[in-house]
Amino acid sequence: MSDLHRFQSLKILAHYDRLEAITRGEYPYPIDWHIYPSNHCQHSCEFCLFIQNGEQANYHVKLPRAILLKAVADAARLDARLIHFSGGGEPLLNRHTLEALKLAQQLSSERVSAGGKPL
């Protein structure tokens, strides 16, 4: 395993202020946000939770533009370090995801990723 992926025993010190807040009964906002723009997918993987009897489930969800952009703005306002676009399908099958990605980068999240790939 490379050093990049090895657990760092002192990593907890990077979040010491958050741990102190929790011990005081406070609930700090998450630093990693996962936004699921869509559960639509162009694949039919056998192991997928959204596949039933070899076919995609018939409930398709795409976040509306206003909700998607509000989620990104909220994450940035609350100092998210990572905004990750993923979900039960391909995030880019929601036509508003590109706009949301651009907004996330404009609002200065430290990292933005989609489908497991940093952008």
Predicted regions and their residues:
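Conserved alpha-helical substructure of the radical SAM core
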Residues: 2-119
